[in-house]
């Protein structure tokens, strides 16, 4: 009996406060984010174009439909979360893609988060103005 290929591949991406759940299915390259088309959802955000870098690096652009749900954060963080989610999902399609994506940093989770505000300060590090007299 032949091994069945799964018809859906899943990857999770996170960046700042944004979390993206990416589902890849074989198709003609249609990308839907939260029920809207990719271009409509990001409306010309230049950083959003980089979210699809994983498809370009692996030569799989146009071979998969992506259904993405993304929550939290702003447009930039969401775009980066989608980029990581797509890269992780593509790894499940073919583990050999790691050699193409790893040098480009597509599989690296950016650990930078917002630093918390401390009491006695105006922001995380900004102290109140100092007066000598």
From Swiss-Prot:
Molecular function GO labels: RNA binding; structural constituent of ribosome
Keywords: Ribonucleoprotein, Ribosomal protein
Biased segments, Basic residues type: 119-133
UniProt-annotated stretches for the region Disordered: 101-133
Domain of life of the source: Bacteria
Entry-linked InterPro entries: Ribosomal_Su5_D2-typ_SF (IPR020568), Ribosomal_uS9 (IPR000754), Ribosomal_uS9_bac/plastid (IPR023035), Ribosomal_uS9_CS (IPR020574), Ribsml_uS5_D2-typ_fold_subgr (IPR014721)
Record field: compositional bias (Basic and acidic residues): 107-118
GO BP term, example: translation
This protein's GO CC annotations: cytosolic small ribosomal subunit
Family designation: Belongs to the universal ribosomal protein uS9 family.
Protein name: Small ribosomal subunit protein uS9
